[in-house]
C-alpha cells in the first residue's frame, strides 16, 4: 500500500512539474505569435498529428487558422508556413535568420552529428562543404560533363526493358537502381560494389530516422531519452552503415583513379582533410555524412520524381500522348540524348514541373529561426522550429487552378521556374539553403524520363485501369510512392 501511494505521489509530482513548466514556457512567448488550435496540457497539439501524413495534417491546421500558424509539439514551439508570402519572407527577405536547421534523434545519428550538408548548422563548416561540392561536382558545367554516364546507364536500362517487352516489370526498382548507379559513377568515379546492400541500408535507415519519437518533442526529459528504444536501433543501423562506408572508403583510397582518370569528390575531400590551410577541419564522419547525403537525397528524390511523373502520365493518357509526341518528334534521329536536347522539350519539362508541384521530393522544409523575426505581421521567437509546407503551397487554390489535377499545360499561361525564384513552386527550396544538387537532380530526372517516353509505349498490367493506379505517398522525410509502380513496356516502332 505504501509503495502504491509513493508511486502516485511521484507521478502527480512529475505531472505537476511538467504542467508548471508548460505554463512557464507559454508565459515567455511574445503576445503577437501566430494563431493556432486550442492545445492540451503537456502534449500541446501532438494529438492533432495522428493518423495521416504530417504535410496533410498541418495543411488542415493552416487552412483553419491561417497560412502562418503555430503548433506546440510537446515542449517545442513550432510554426508552419503555408503561403508564398510567408515562404518568401523566411527564405529570401529574412533568409539569414531562417537559414539554420534543427535536428532530431534520427537525423543526428544517421547524418553523422550534422557534419553533412543537409542537416549541418548554418556555419563555416556548411559553407565550406557546400562550396567544395558545388565547385567540384554540382555546378551546371560539371553536370553537363557527366552526360555520357547518363547515356550509358540509360542504354542499359532500355536494353533491360526491351528484354521484358510485353511483361509486367517493377519500374520502381529498375529506375532506382539506374539513378543510384548514375550518382555513384558521377560522385565516386565508379559504381559502388554491393550497391543493392547500400540502397537497402539507406532506405531502411531513412524509414527509421523519419519516425516520431517522444524524446524529440520532450528534449529535457532524460527518462524519455533513456526509454527511446528506436535510438538504440538507429545506432545499430549506423554501425552497419559505418562498416559498409569504412570498407568503401578504404578501397577508394588505394585505387589509382576513377573512370574520369583524375580526382573525384571523395579524393578532393581527402586532399582538403590533409591540407593544413583548410579553414574548417574535414573529419571522416563529415566525409561519410556527405556520402549518406548523396544516396539519401541524390538517389531517392530523382528516382521518386521520375516514378511520380510516369504514374501521373499513366493516369492521363492524353498528357502521355502529348509528351511522347514532343519527345519523338524532337529527338528523332538523335543518338546521344542529354541536357542540351532535353532543353528543347518544353512540354516534358512542364511534366516534370507538375510532378514536382504535386509530389515535391521534400514535402516540408525544416528550418530554425535563430533570431526573433516578424513574418507576415506575426512575431516568431528565437529558436522556433519552422516547417515550410511545400506540399501545401503547391496545392493551394489561391495560386493554382484545379490544384489537385495533373495539368502540365498550365505552365503555358503562367510559366514558373523551379529554382527558388517563384515561391508558388519551390520543390528544391530557396535562398541560402536551396538544394545544391538542383541541376544535377533535374538532369537525372529529365533525361531518363525523355528516354523512357521515346523508346516505349507504356501499358498497365492486365485487368488494371488508370483509376486503379495507387498514388499513396510513403511516410518519411521525402515523399516517394508507397508501393512500387508496375508497368508493361512495349517497344516503340517509329515506322508503325
From Swiss-Prot:
Instruction: Give a single Pfam family match.
Output: p450
Species of origin: Thymus vulgaris (Thyme)
Tell me the GO BP annotations in alphabetical order: terpenoid biosynthetic process
Give the UniProt keywords, A-Z: Heme, Iron, Membrane, Metal-binding, Monooxygenase, Oxidoreductase, Signal-anchor, Transmembrane, Transmembrane helix
Q: How does it sit in the membrane?
A: Single-pass type II membrane protein
Q: In which pathway does it act?
A: Secondary metabolite biosynthesis; terpenoid biosynthesis
The gene that this protein is the product of is CYP71D182
Record keywords: Heme included?
A: yes
Full protein name: Cytochrome P450 71D182
Question: Which positions does UniProt annotate for heme binding?
Answer: 435
Location(s) in or outside the cell:
Membrane
- Tell me which cofactor or cofactors this protein depends on: heme
Any one of the GO CC terms: membrane
Q: Which PANTHER family match?
A: OS06G0641600 PROTEIN, OS08G0105600 PROTEIN
The EC code for this enzyme is: 1.14.14.-
Asked if the Swiss-Prot or TrEMBL record annotates the protein with the keyword Transmembrane helix, the reply is yes
Amino acid at each position: 500500500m505504501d509503495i502504491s501511494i509513493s508511486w502516485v505521489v511521484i507521478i502527480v509530482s512529475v505531472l505537476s512539474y511538467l504542467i508548471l513548466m508548460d505554463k512557464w514556457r507559454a508565459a515567455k512567448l511574445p503576445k503577437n505569435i501566430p494563431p493556432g488550435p486550442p492545445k492540451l496540457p503537456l502534449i500541446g497539439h501532438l494529438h492533432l498529428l495522428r493518423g495521416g501524413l504530417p504535410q496533410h495534417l498541418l495543411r488542415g491546421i493552416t487552412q483553419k487558422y491561417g497560412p502562418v500558424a503555430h503548433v506546440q509539439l510537446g515542449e517545442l514551439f513550432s510554426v508552419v508556413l503555408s503561403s508564398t508570402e510567408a515562404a518568401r519572407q523566411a527564405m529570401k527577405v529574412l533568409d539569414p535568420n531562417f537559414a539554420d536547421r534543427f535536428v532530431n534523434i534520427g537525423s543526428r545519428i544517421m547524418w553523422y552529428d550534422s557534419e553533412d550538408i543537409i542537416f549541418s548548422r548554418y556555419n563555416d563548416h556548411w559553407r565550406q562543404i557546400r562550396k567544395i561540392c558545388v565547385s567540384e561536382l554540382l555546378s551546371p558545367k560539371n553536370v553537363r560533363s557527366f552526360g555520357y554516364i547518363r547515356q550509358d546507364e540509360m542504354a542499359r536500362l532500355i536494353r533491360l526493358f526491351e528484354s521484358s517487352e510485353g511483361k509486367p516489370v517493377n519500374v520502381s526498382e529498375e529506375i532506382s537502381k539506374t539513378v543510384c548507379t548514375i550518382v555513384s559513377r558521377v560522385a565516386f568515379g565508379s559504381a559502388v560494389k554491393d550497391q543493392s546492400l547500400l540502397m537497402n541500408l539507406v532506405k531502411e535507415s531513412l524509414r527509421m530516422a523519419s519516425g516520431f519519437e517522444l524524446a524529440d518533442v520532450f528534449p529535457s526529459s532524460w527518462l524519455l531519452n533513456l526509454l527511446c528504444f528506436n535510438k538504440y536501433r538507429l545506432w545499430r543501423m549506423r554501425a552497419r552503415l559505418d562498416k559498409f562506408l569504412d570498407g568503401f572508403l578504404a578501397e577508394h583510397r588505394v585505387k589509382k583513379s576513377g573512370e574520369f582518370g583524375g580526382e573525384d569528390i571523395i579524393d578532393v575531400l581527402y586532399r582538403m582533410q590533409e591540407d593544413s590551410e583548410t579553414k574548417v577541419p574535414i573529419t571522416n564522419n563529415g566525409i561519410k555524412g556527405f556520402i549518406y547525403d548523396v544516396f539519401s537525397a541524390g538517389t531517392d528524390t530523382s528516382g521518386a520524381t521520375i516514378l511520380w511523373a510516369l504514374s501521373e502520365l499513366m493516369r492521363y493518357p492524353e498528357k502521355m500522348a502529348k509528351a511522347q509526341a514532343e519527345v519523338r518528334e524532337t529527338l528523332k534521329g538523335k543518338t546521344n540524348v542529354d541536357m542540351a536536347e532535353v532543353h528543347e522539350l518544353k512540354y516534358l519539362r512542364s511534366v516534370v514541373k507538375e510532378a514536382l508541384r504535386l509530389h515535391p521530393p521534400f514535402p516540408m522544409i525544416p528550418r530554425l529561426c535563430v533570431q526573433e523575426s516578424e513574418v507576415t505581421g506575426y512575431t516568431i521567437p528565437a529558436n522556433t522550429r519552422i516547417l515550410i509546407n511545400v506540399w501545401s503551397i503547391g496545392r493551394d487554390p489561391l495560386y493554382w487552378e484545379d490544384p489537385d489535377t495533373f495539368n502540365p499545360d498550365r505552365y503555358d499561361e503562367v510559366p514558373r521556374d523551379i529554382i527558388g525564384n517563384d515561391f508558388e513552386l519551390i520543390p528544391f527550396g530557396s535562398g541560402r539553403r536551396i538544394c545544391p544538387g538542383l541541376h544535377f537532380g533535374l538532369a537525372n530526372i529529365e533525361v531518363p524520363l525523355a528516354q523512357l517516353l521515346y523508346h516505349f509505349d507504356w501499358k498497365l498490367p492486365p485487368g488494371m485501369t488508370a483509376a486503379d493506379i495507387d498514388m499513396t505517398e510513403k511516410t518519411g522525410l521525402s515523399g516517394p510512392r508507397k508501393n512500387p509502380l508496375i508497368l508493361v513496356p512495349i517497344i516503340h516502332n517509329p515506322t508503325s
